[in-house]
Amino acid sequence: MNEILKKSYVELKDSLNSGKISSTELVSACINRIREVDGAVKAFLYLDEKKVLNSAEESDKRRKEGKPLSEFDGMPVAIKDNICIRDTITSCSSKILENYKSPFHATVVEKLLEKGFILFPRTNMDEFAMGSSTENSAFQTTRNPFDLERIPGGSSGGSAAAVAASMVPLALGSDTGGSVRQPASLCGLYGLKPTYGTVSRYGLVAYASSLDQIGPFSRELQGCIDLYSVISGKDVRDSTSIHRPKFSASDVQPQDFKGLKVGVIKMTPEIQSEVVKSYDKVLNQLKEKGATLVDLDFSKFGFAIPIYYIIATAECSSNLSRFDGIRFGSRKDKTGKLEDLFVDSRTEGFGPEVKRRILLGTFSLSAGYYDAYYGTAQKARALIRKEYESFFSKVDCILQPTSPTTAFKIGEKTKDPIQMYKADIWTTSVNLAGLPAMSVPMGADQKGLPIGLQITTPHFQEGKLFGIALALSTLEGMNIQFPESIK
């Protein structure tokens, strides 16, 4: 691996700003690393090498003239395949959109380009962001760089794997029920799901509009802080965007463990023993450093997954109705009949998991069942929000494992969707409540597979969230040894 890519994100940023390395050198190193390892990892669906090199050369020219767009000018960032980039295919890893080129930039893309970031599209994902393993892509299965026989998590598995394998220092994904945090956990990364409404969804292909949020990946906390500071902010093109003071890195609130009230949960027998061991080790260190641990009763959250899947699939059924082979999506016109065109285009264009969720969502919204399922789920969602409000009247943050297990083997759970859904047991409730949460590295199991710790704070308290993450990074056993050689 090129020596440049052995540098931390902060070192890379400092080297770009001091002139020790050029963007062209950094981008070339990323391209060579992708050539070297992505045949095995399969994080990227496509990369226009000429385009990214041209962008790097333009960045170097700006710096040479003393006119960099920002301190991030020339920094590579990978983009998930459901975030629109003008004149670039945005397929959502689905056959129905395999040739769709977006006519516009997503707001987050515009913000990145304004700061001079070098975009590396497109990373693989579960089709339309529906999955927890990136096995649901119509094109390829992404593998975990720590063990190529295992999944990287999902649905943003391509973005997570690209960062974990040192192909790029930063990446963007989307999180509907854990799709940034869970792959971050399984790939040893920092991954942020921001407060709902703080990052524009304009240009993000919608799965479940009331749950989706774009979030960053990085090996280092500072990478997530910097990306969030760039992509957050009010956007008039997104009606769910919230007007708040612009976040900056200076808003990070350093946290002292002494006096910090930390909400914790009880582990259950189905949780992998090494996950429990790592979690207990963190809690013991927190007690030693003066934190107050408060046991929280999460029994009411046992229904979070069914609530999530009723709401998410209902919104998915509505959002994906536009992909009919006429307005959007590839057309399969075999008989010349309009109804057959709809049926054939969607039958051939959507994969099994997407079809399953469309059917479930359509049923939940159907006459006679709407109140019993969707209406009841929304009422239960409100109760989850109130439960979190009650928790945060007692604690400053909640700590729990991000995932109940480390990365499982490819194909292990594909035939049992319920077991796959349970991988999101601790992440979905955060989306239902619209809260900010982050997965941070919490060491590894005996096989060297990463374990993640989820931090949750009240709405709009990303500054505190980052401060707690920074403090946690100083604890013993939190670091991850990333693989240089991937075979």
Swiss-Prot record:
Pfam family for this entry, one: Amidase
Keywords for the protein's UniProt record, in alphabetical order: ATP-binding, Ligase, Nucleotide-binding, Protein biosynthesis
Active-site residue list: K80 (charge relay system), S155 (charge relay system), S179 (acyl-ester intermediate)
Molecular functions (GO terms): ATP binding; glutaminyl-tRNA synthase (glutamine-hydrolyzing) activity
HAMAP family reported in the protein's UniProt record: GatA (MF_00120)
Biological role: Allows the formation of correctly charged Gln-tRNA(Gln) through the transamidation of misacylated Glu-tRNA(Gln) in organisms which lack glutaminyl-tRNA synthetase. The reaction takes place in the presence of glutamine and ATP through an activated gamma-phospho-Glu-tRNA(Gln).
Name of the protein this chain belongs to: Glutamyl-tRNA(Gln) amidotransferase subunit A
Organism whose genome encodes this protein: Leptospira interrogans serogroup Icterohaemorrhagiae serovar Lai (strain 56601)
